Curated annotation (Swiss-Prot):
Protein name: ATP-dependent DNA helicase II subunit 2
InterPro entries per UniProt: Ku70/Ku80_beta-barrel_dom (IPR006164), Ku80 (IPR024193), Ku_C_sf (IPR036494), Ku_N (IPR005161), Ku_PK_bind (IPR014893), SPOC-like_C_dom_sf (IPR016194), VWF_A (IPR002035), vWFA_dom_sf (IPR036465)
Quaternary data: Heterodimer of Ku70 and Ku80.
E.C. numbers: 3.6.4.12
Compositionally biased region (Basic residues): 567-576
Stretches the record annotates as Disordered: 277-299, 567-586
Species of the source: Emericella nidulans (strain FGSC A4 / ATCC 38163 / CBS 112.46 / NRRL 194 / M139) (Aspergillus nidulans)
CDD domains attached to this UniProt entry: KU80 (cd00873)
A matching Pfam family: Ku
Annotated catalysed reactions: ATP + H2O = ADP + phosphate + H(+)
Domain (Ku) ranges: 235-484
Length: 725
């Protein structure tokens, strides 16, 4: 079970916090809230009911706290009691966090109030307690009863963090470790800084700058994972049921590496006609007419699956079948072979949970590409000294003999067995076996590719000098280029050393980018999502110094390899390009006496539309072709029996869109789709055809925007608005 946590954030919302300083676009309060929001949203993302938060506003216009009758506690408001934060609490707090019109309020009194909140909520139970104070160090601070405050913080084991903001001429608080020192500091503010620093030092807390804290929020937080054993059993050599000399060691198995997957999106529908918390009826599909703007009024979409079989005598030619009436069948060629549940149980392999050693192999003879799974560790059963000694002996034996063990693993009874490799791992204070799954014979894919250093002719002759083989100059140039791109660093003595890929500093861009986007949208539902943090993209490009160092080697490699730039693909209007000439060099059109097309036939609309555009000599011809296609599409919609012609309309409209993008006439298509949408929604084409409009939206056949054609006058926002209606 996760530890219980209670954190109280004290945020300075005084009048001075509404100012912008040091060239920042954000106010001091907005800048401070970047850190607070990051902490809060990370806690909310865990979904833990035992992770609770509280927020206190310092220097507020009014007073709202249980100690407000005393003068020292004026202009301090409890914005949120200690509780589990949800989406609604985030939105409510965002509306209340605003700069006030006063700079009155005692930070020390706010600290006392936070301690009181934690004592009241946590009592004497086992909790992780933390208080975070963010202030610019201005205003009056009461230095009385500091000994009592320090004593209470230590007694209740409360972690205290105090962060400063930026002042008028630079950082308010000095931080020698972070390279910050303010010159000509106001004596009153210097006194406040000394007071706050003294409190944190006596409480064994942290006193730092907000700039450092905000920068550290860019570093993704790796979620701690509580270890859960995937196997508890025996590592055994020999059959203990038949032989007394068999070896059995109680062991446990835990994951060492596991892919961390980003959160997945769930489907919801925006329902304004339902009360909060009320669910809609069960349905197989749900198509919302509008996109939800925030997290409110969302209803779960539940799918209903039905099974049907053909029956000519039934209405509609099909009848429903219950899931319990279904039988399993295995594909055999082009037919299905039925196997009943009774027979299927017989075919299953009966196994018992165990890890049985089947052999050993020299480490140098094992190929690393045989790894087939995540990595696990095998340790002795906890609190079993005899098992620890036995496993340690086995690990050291493998290490000294430079060998690996091969074992047959069954994690649970009657589960399919797997082959695993066991490798010794010995650290100064830790020993274990590293385990990876090995492939069976059917899992190995063996392919043979042509050799890279010689060519075998049809007659069987081996050729080492060939146009498809690199010569010595090319190999030398490539070697020097690769060497120049080698990652290197320096040790404590300044000597060059190879630096491996820093796993501890390489975070999953997809995982943390999705999490950051979710948190950003939760706080600011209408603002654009900020760009990804630099630490997530640092490995998307080689280091600058390596590129500069390898530049001359790359130029020589290009010269030796005779690399030539491929001419860019021709752009522009199709009619402006030269037509492709046949290999015969004959003019096929003149030989066939093909006349220019005037009318487009509804029975062969798409090919004839393309021919008309290819033969068009002016814009009027193209306009006429688009007009004819619009008429044909509207006739297909008007005379469609149900959705019989919807696919034809979608295909035809898609061809018109692609062709007009290629001919750089996006305006013609945009006029067409606007008129078609109006006719569909106003039911001018034979009744309610909204389902067709939904199909066109799903096929992304909306307006041509500027990203798709430079000549388009439609922006991305206009295109989205057009499709959302």
């Amino acid at each position: 079970m996760a530890d219980k946590e209670a954190t109280v954030y004290i945020v300075d919302v005084g009048k001075s916090m509404g100012e912008r300083r040091n060239g920042r676009d954000l106010t001091d309060l907005e800048w401070a809230m970047k850190y607070v929001w990051d902490c809060i949203t990370n806690t909310v993302a865990t979904g833990r009911k035992t992770a609770m938060l509280g927020v206190i506003g310092l220097k507020t216009d009014g007073t709202d706290n249980e100690l407000g009758d005393e003068s020292h506690f004026s202009h301090i408001s409890v914005l949120s009691e200690i509780k589990q934060f949800l989406m609604s609490d985030i939105r409510e707090l965002g509306e209340r966090i605003k700069p006030s019109s006063v700079d009155k309020g005692d930070a020390i009194s706010a600290l006392i109030l936070a301690i009181q909140m934690i004592i009241t909520h946590c009592k004497k139970l086992k909790w992780k307690r933390k208080i975070v104070l963010i202030t610019n160090g201005l205003g009056r601070m009461n230095s009385e009863n500091l000994d009592d405050i320090v004593s209470k913080v230590k007694e209740d084991n409360i972690e205290l963090i105090i962060l400063d903001l930026t002042g008028r001429r630079g950082p308010d608080f000095d931080d020698a470790e972070y390279g910050i020192k303010e010159e000509d500091k106001d004596p009153h503010k210097a006194s406040n800084e000394t007071l706050l620093r003294t409190i944190t030092e006596r409480c064994d807390g942290v006193f730092g700058t907000l700039e450092q804290a905000v920068e550290e929020t860019e570093i993704p937080r790796v979620k701690p994972v509580r270890p859960v054993a995937s196997f508890k059993g025996f590592l055994q050599l020999g059959n203990p049921e038949e032989y007394d000399t068999a070896v059995r060691i109680p062991v446990e198995r835990y994951p060492r590496t596991m892919v961390a997957k980003p959160p997945t999106a769930s489907q919801f529908v925006l329902r304004s006609d339902l009360a909060a918390g009320q669910e809609g009826p069960v349905s197989s599909t749900a198509v919302p007419e509008t996109q939800p703007e925030d997290g409110s009024n969302l209803t779960n979409v539940r799918n209903l699956r039905t099974y049907q079989v053909s029956d000519e005598s039934a209405p509609g030619g099909k009848i429903d079948v219950e899931r319990d009436d279904l039988a399993k069948g295995y594909e055999y060629g082009r037919t299905a072979v039925h196997i009943s549940e009774t027979d299927e149980n017989i075919t299953r392999l009966e196994t018992t949970a165990a890890m049985e050693l089947v052999g050993f192999i020299q480490s140098e003879r094992y190929d690393r590409y045989m790894h087939l799974s995540n990595t696990h560790i095998i340790i002795a059963n906890r609190a079993n000294d005899k098992a620890s000694l036995a496993l340690s002996s086995f690990i050291h034996a493998l290490f000294e003999l430079e060998s690996y063990a091969v074992a047959r693993l069954v994690t649970k009874e009657n589960k399919p067995p797997t082959l695993v490799l066991l490798a010794p791992s010995i650290e100064p204070d830790y020993e274990c076996l590293l385990e990876v799954q090995l492939p069976f014979a059917e899992d190995v894919r063996t392919y043979r590719f042509p050799p890279l250093d010689h060519v075998v002719t049809v007659s069987g002759k081996v050729v080492t000098q060939h146009r498809n083989l690199p010569n010595d100059d090319l190999l030398d140039a490539m070697d020097k280029y690769v060497d120049s791109m080698e990652l290197k660093g320096t040790d404590e003595d300044g000597d060059l050393v190879n630096t491996p890929f820093p796993i501890d500093d390489s975070f999953s861009p997809v995982l943390h980018r999705v999490n950051a986007a979710i948190r950003s949208r939760a706080i600011h539902p209408n603002d654009p999502i900020p760009p990804p943090a630099r630490i997530l993209t640092q490995f998307s490009q080689p280091p600058e110094h390596l590129l500069k160092n390898a530049e001359r080697h790359l130029k020589r490699l290009i010269e030796v390899a005779d690399v030539k730039k491929v001419p860019p693909k021709a752009k522009g209007r199709k009619r402006a390009r030269e037509p492709e000439k046949p290999l015969s060099g004959l003019d096929v059109d003149s030989l066939l006496h093909q006349e220019k097309r005037v009318r487009i036939s509804p029975n062969n609309a798409i090919p004839e539309f393309k021919q008309t555009l290819a033969q068009a000599e002016n814009i009027e011809t193209m306009k006429d072709a688009v007009k004819q296609m619009r008429s044909i599409l509207e006739d297909q919609i008007r005379h469609s029996l149900g959705d019989a012609n919807y696919d034809r309309v979608t295909e035809g409209l898609g061809v018109v869109r692609e062709e007009l993008i290629a001919y750089e006439e996006p305006g013609l298509y945009n006029d067409l789709i606007r008129k078609l949408k109006e006719a569909l929604l106003k039911e001018k084409l034979g009744g309610d055809q909204r389902e067709l409009w939904w199909l066109l939206k799903r096929s992304k056949l909306g307006l041509i925007e500027q990203r798709e054609s430079e000549l388009s006058e439609v922006t991305e926002e206009e295109a989205k608005k057009f499709m959302s209606a």
